[in-house]
Amino acid sequence: MDTMRQRILVVDDDASLAEMLTIVLRGEGFDTAVIGDGTQALTAVRELRPDLVLLDLMLPGMNGIDVCRVLRADSGVPIVMLTAKTDTVDVVLGLESGADDYIMKPFKPKELVARVRARLRRNDDEPAEMLSIADVEIDVPAHKVTRNGEQISLTPLEFDLLVALARKPRQVFTRDVLLEQVWGYRHPADTRLVNVHVQRLRAKVEKDPENPTVVLTVRGVGYKAGPP
């Protein structure tokens, strides 16, 4: 197997959908593995070490929300939820449990591939770049965040969100702009993605998430970096 090919784990009990996803993703140059059970998905992630997980919300064994929560306890692997539900509560629960993004069924294959590529994009040849917000230091090429020498563990998406804010400390970012820059959306989308991930980021980087100094809310507009 080509070691440069990225591996996608598809977790879905719908065999026909899983087969379609496999065909589409392999056609785009990805390796794929398919699991149809939530509990087995946890073992598969440990054994296969995928670069990204496509995770259905409704699964036998363990539902997607619980799978997401368990994975996030010790893994930063990108997770994109697949859901047929339009229920706001389920989407938000999934995001709060650690999913990076979600896509509603039915979806166009090109849209799915774009979401996957947005979560996998990484530049291994990034030049040296050190950023800071308040007392938080960010080593961009090392993908490392510290406060007073203590490392703060972030998922790749949380890291990208923090870097986007830190690179333009005077700019107030609307949610739509963050969706484009961090998630790779090219059209208006669900701004709850931004709100939930800001909450998750604050829980990790703020000394007091209720009184943030790193990621500030600009009421009626969006978010900005706190003062250095």
Swiss-Prot record:
Residues 128-227 bind DNA. Coiled coil: none annotated. The modification 4-aspartylphosphate is found at residue 56. Its cofactor is Ca(2+); Mg(2+). Its main location: cytoplasm. Induction: Expressed in culture (at protein level). Constitutively expressed in infected human blood-derived macrophages and mouse macrophage cell line J774A. Autoregulates its own expression. C-terminal domain binds DNA and interacts with MtrB. This is DNA-binding response regulator MtrA. It comes from Mycobacterium tuberculosis (strain ATCC 25618 / H37Rv). The lineage of its organism: Bacteria, Bacillati, Actinomycetota, Actinomycetes, Mycobacteriales.
